Amino acid sequence: MTATPKFAHVVLQTSRFEAMRDWYCTVLDAHVVYEGHGLCFITFDEEHHRVALLGAPTALEPRNPGAAGMHHTAYTFDTLGDLLDRYESLKSKGIEPKVPIQHGVTTSLYYQDPDGNFVELQIDNFSTPDEATAYMNGPEYGGNPVGVSFDPVLIPQALSAGTPVDRITTHAWALETTPDLPNPMIALTS
């Protein structure tokens, strides 16, 4: 095989059609490309749609964290400042992350949509994929690949105090500033 596909979109089946449409448009700063016949196509970039909603004619069972299936979708921002801007914007609208995690390789905020699906907003903590891969093959990541919880409220304070971004985006900083937060794996799987 010589052709490599690129990811196009995710389709979510829902009985909370309007709430899901509005949530994804808000969280991803996206817009509806098409809506009708129980379908909604949403995009935030050059692709004609990145998220699609399939409206169920009857009420669906709630998300079951104990069932097999996709756990979350993830969306990357260019800078910590961009991620913080989105965090602050969403917070002002009453949308707060359920699980902030310093993975080491990424700094991530996990939200839950109205159906309970996780959506990760993140930044890469390394400049290149090779650097990220090297970190993932190193001892810190090998010892704790999920990472540690942190309080995103503390990041703007740290930046204002002159703490470098490459320090804030580490396990060590998260553990120093918020040592008593619960294991993020529990929140991600419940």
From Swiss-Prot:
Per the record, what are the reactions this protein catalyses? biphenyl-2,3-diol + O2 = 2-hydroxy-6-oxo-6-phenylhexa-2,4-dienoate + H(+)
**Record keywords:** Aromatic hydrocarbons catabolism, Dioxygenase, Iron, Metal-binding, Oxidoreductase
Its Enzyme Commission number(s) read: 1.13.11.39
GO MF terms, alphabetically ordered: biphenyl-2,3-diol 1,2-dioxygenase activity; ferrous iron binding
| SUPFAM superfamilies listed in its UniProt record | Glyoxalase/Bleomycin resistance protein/Dihydroxybiphenyl dioxygenase (SSF54593)
The entry's Fe cation-binding residues are: H9, H72, E120
Please give the family membership noted in the entry. Answer: Belongs to the extradiol ring-cleavage dioxygenase family.
Quote the protein name from its UniProt record: Biphenyl-2,3-diol 1,2-dioxygenase 2
Organism expressing this protein natively: Rhodococcus globerulus
Report which gene this protein is encoded by.
Answer: bphC2
